[in-house]
């Protein structure tokens, strides 16, 4: 890969990991438009590391408080808000882990097509618009319940379908349950930590078994640009989402889906 390709792909990973706009669709475009080949397992690991570091550093205070609270109070009857939130992240992650483990091979073989990605980009974009337009959006993250965390975790399973957008579907579920936009985004980003970590570990295991040649400079640049773009994305999204709402992202998803459909049927 050239340095230009590394930078573009790393930025795509960093931004689309957290915005509700589907990473699958964006990673498909360079291949369709420019004929870029697959970036390889090592690069995939590197950009996941960059995204993971970004979200963990941004939420370092919350993660520290949740970890301490969970270790000291996790199995007691009296639990603080931080301890409960830690449990909710764990509970919300379990459905995607189980279904992902069972269905990963089938999904990769049958669902990772341009037509599927285009369809899910449009359909779940419209669902995001409906949730944002009709939901009450009154509840803070501190008021999240176990039942709500389970529902959001079950919704996250749909993100295994390429084009859905993990952040998009979890925010959609949160909005439908009455959470404020920023609360939906914060819980979605916290849920991303074990998901990105798991995806990175799986890619690492695949890399070790593949015995693939490693370009360390490409990995360093990939991780760095993924980190910077992801961190800025998280910061700006949380700063603006309460004011701008989800409509700009919905419009963008519809446009992206239309472009992908054009590639399919052209």
Swiss-Prot record:
The membrane topology of this protein is: Multi-pass membrane protein
Name the residues that span the membrane: 1-21, 39-59, 87-107, 113-133, 143-163, 187-207, 218-238, 244-264
Documented EC number(s)? 3.6.1.27
Query: What enzyme category does the UniProt record give?
Result: hydrolase
The Gene Ontology terms for molecular function here are:
undecaprenyl-diphosphatase activity
Q: Which reaction does it catalyse?
A: di-trans,octa-cis-undecaprenyl diphosphate + H2O = di-trans,octa-cis-undecaprenyl phosphate + phosphate + H(+)
Q: Which GO terms describe its cellular component?
A: plasma membrane
Tell me which Pfam families the record gives. BacA (PF02673)
A biological process (GO) of this protein is: response to antibiotic
Q: Which InterPro entries match?
A: UppP
Compartments, record wording: Cell inner membrane
Does Manganese appear among the keywords?
no
Q: What this chain does, per the record?
A: Catalyzes the dephosphorylation of undecaprenyl diphosphate (UPP). Confers resistance to bacitracin.
The UniProt entry, under NCBIfam families, shows: PRK00281.2-4, undec_PP_bacA
Q: What else is known?
A: Bacitracin is thought to be involved in the inhibition of peptidoglycan synthesis by sequestering undecaprenyl diphosphate, thereby reducing the pool of lipid carrier available.
| Similarity comment | Belongs to the UppP family.
Q: What is the recorded name of this protein?
A: Undecaprenyl-diphosphatase
The gene is: uppP
């Amino acid at each position: 890969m050239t340095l230009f390709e590394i930078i573009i792909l790393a930025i795509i990973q960093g931004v689309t990991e957290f915005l509700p706009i589907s990473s699958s669709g964006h990673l498909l475009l360079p291949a369709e438009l420019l004929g870029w080949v697959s970036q390889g397992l090592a690069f995939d690991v590197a950009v996941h590391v960059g995204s993971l570091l970004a979200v963990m550093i941004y939420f370092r205070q919350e993660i520290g408080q949740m970890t301490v609270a969970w270790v000291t109070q996790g199995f007691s009857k009296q639990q603080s808000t931080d301890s409960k939130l830690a449990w909710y992240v764990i509970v919300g992650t379990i459905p995607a882990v189980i279904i992902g483990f069972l269905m990963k091979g089938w999904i990769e073989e049958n669902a990772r097509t341009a037509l599927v990605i285009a369809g899910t980009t449009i359909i779940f974009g419209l669902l995001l618009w409906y949730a944002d337009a009709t939901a009450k959006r009154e509840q803070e993250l501190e008021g999240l319940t176990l039942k709500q965390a389970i529902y959001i975790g079950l919704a996250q399973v749909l993100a295994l379908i390429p084009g859905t957008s993990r952040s998009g579907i979890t925010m959609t579920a949160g909005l439908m349950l009455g959470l404020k936009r920023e609360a939906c985004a914060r819980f979605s980003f916290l849920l991303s930590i074990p998901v990105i970590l798991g995806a990175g570990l799986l890619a690492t295991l695949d890399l070790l078994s593949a015995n693939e040649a490693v370009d360390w400079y490409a990995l360093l640049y990939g991780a760095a640009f993924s980190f910077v773009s992801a961190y800025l994305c998280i910061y700006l999204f949380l700063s603006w989402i309460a004011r701008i709402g989800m409509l700009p992202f919905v419009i963008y998803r519809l446009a992206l889906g239309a472009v992908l459909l054009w590639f399919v049927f052209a």
